[in-house]
Structures are given as C-alpha cells and as structure tokens.
Amino acid sequence: MGVLPVCLGKGTGLVSMITDWTKTYEAVMLLGTTTDTQDTSGTVLTQSAVEVDERTVLEVCSQFEGEYDQIPPMYSALKVNGKKLYELARAGVEVERKPRRVVINSLRVNDINLEDDVKTVTITVDCSKGTYIRTLCDDIGKKLGCGACMMSLKRTRVGDFVIDDTLTLNQIAALALKGEIEDYIVSIDEMFSDYRKLTVDAVYNRLLYNGNKLPLEAIVSDGGEFLDMEKFRIYDAEGSFVGIYKYIGGQFVLEKMFYDNSDT
C-alpha cells in the first residue's frame, strides 16, 4: 500500500521514467522468524530466539546504507529462462539468482521493540529502483543472527510524489462524480519543473514535432548559457509543451517526445 502514481493519456510516456525514480518505504520487521516469501504471508521456515540489543540493531541496519548487492527473492516477478520466479517457487523449484546492485540512500530506524513477545523493528528506507524491502529485512535478520521477515510495508514516496498529497480510490471516485478530478491531475510538463523551459521559433515547429535535432537558432526564449548534456522542457511557438530535449554539442537532441499528430 502507499503512493502509486497513475499516468493518463500521453502521460503514459512517463511510466518508464517513473520506474527509475527513488522511493521511500516504511516497513516493520518481525525478528526471529524467516519465511519462504520473506514476509509474514509466507510459510515459516525458521523461528529463533531474539538475543540482540538496540545498539546491535542500529549498527547492523547502518551497514546496509550505500550500494548493496541484493539477491532477488524467489517470490518475485523477475524471469529466469522465460519463467517468472514466483511460478517456479510455487512449483517447489528454487533456482540460482544473480545479485543485483541496489542503493540504500538512507535507512532510519524509527522504533525498536525488544520487550514484547513479538519483537519488531520499524524502519524508513530511501532506495533505488529494484530494491526488495522484504529481502532487505531478511538480510538484516541474517546479520543479526536471529532471522527476520517483513511484517508490513507502506510506500510513502515515489520521486517527488509523497503520501500526504495522495488521494484514495474512494476520494478519486467522489471527485470524478463532482467533475472536479481534473483539478488534481498534474500536467506532464510539471513533472519536469526542475528543467529549464525553452521555446522555439515558429519556423522550427515542424522539426520539433518530428523529433528532429534543433539548432541553437531555433530557440527564441532567453535560456542563458546551455550546459552540455543538460535537459530542457521544449515548447512550440504557440506555448504547447512538446517534449524533453538534451543539449549536446551545440544542438538540442530529443530525449522524450510527448507530442502526437492529434495535437494539431
């Protein structure tokens, strides 16, 4: 559960970019238990006494910050020889998986409960794409020596989208009935607000629509100095957003197009 950006219309062109964004999760680890799925929905594999203190938990968790080679879980949608891993796992087949390099930008321990019968650690993880939080919990448990699995998970951020700004499905349905849903839709170019905005001369509109390279003289807006490999939001002469271009060697090269022929 948690933040899930939804792309509509031409905005579906953002999907491949969104998957590359960093994400933030809040997770609760259950100490002393391991399962085949690495979370509490799976079959219990081991149960061990939890004989660690808070200092050890903090030290071990801090060791996972930075780059980290993570072995994907068997219960995942990754494919090996054309077969999804979870299909193999359900058939009782386990195959070797190659470690994948992920990045844990930060791992904050919010709460450590070692007093109750159910011993838990609550963490907030800021990470790169492709990171399995339940596998992270399992790996932390291994280093602690008692094992662990994920008890709960909530995605609180995807890129610039944070959970405080999200709408529930019920809220979306209610807004749609009132005809107010468009007030909450983020325009495509707003997604690139960190990029500088440039406008082309009308003479170059056709080149722009076709995704051709654009010379410096095509730009009529004052963009200041252009840095090599810098990305820009490019608009046509009428002020409509067309796409993302990258400045390379004195010209602008298409990075991502959001224009189609139906726009004219």
Annotate each predicted stretch with a short phrase.
Residues 1-167, 243-244:
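RNA pseudouridine synthases
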Residues 3, 18-21, 55, 60, ...:
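Accessory RNA 3′-end/elbow-binding domains used by RNA modification enzymes
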